[in-house]
Amino acid sequence: TEMYSNTGGQASKASNIGEVCQFAAAGKEISKKSLAEICMTYGYIYVAQIALGANMAQAVKAIAEAEAYPGPSIIIGYAPCELHGVKGGMTNCQNEMKKAVEAGYWNLFTFNPALKAEGKNPFTLTSKAGKMDKYQEFLANETRYSRLSRAFPDRAKALFEKNQEAAEARYTHLTKLVDPVSYTHLTL
């Protein structure tokens, strides 16, 4: 959920730039950590980043691969919650997942270390490049972001641009991992 949602919605290292939550009433200023990439650096953990509402087939395949993998696995899913404040309510949850992926806010991928034994790249990027013209619209659809626009419009504009730039850089980085030469740094 990109925050500590089980204790009331406090900012965490998983909170994104410009997100308004407890302890970040003026919008979080720094990028979120990438738990998926942290896990990939170990080289022996199966890692998947999914969003059921965006790509059910990728999610189901990742879950099956994670279960079959003979070592530790982690699946990180984009899961809107009430604290996100999705416009139209939680009945729009599946559609919000799709919007997150289409805009480039959330990327779908897997890292399957078992593929290395077959001489294959363990990293698979399922997401296409985000439709960056939809990015700000996506942020505005969740009150965890839109609240900042109402309270501090200039700050919101700057932080949301920074958020989008981070998303573009993240996707560029992920595309480099598709190259077999680039992924070698993922193993210790």
Task: Identify the function of each model-found stretch.
Residues 1-73, 80-82, 86-100:
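Thiamine diphosphate
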Residues 19, 23, 31, 46-47, ...:
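Generic preference for well-ordered secondary structure
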Residues 59-155, 162, 175:
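Glycine/aspartate-rich loop-and-adjacent alpha/beta segment that forms the canonical ThDP
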Residues 165-169:
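A short structural micro-motif
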Residues 171-182:
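Short, amphipathic C-terminal "tail helix"
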Residues 184-188:
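Conserved small/polar residues in nucleotide/adenosyl-binding loops
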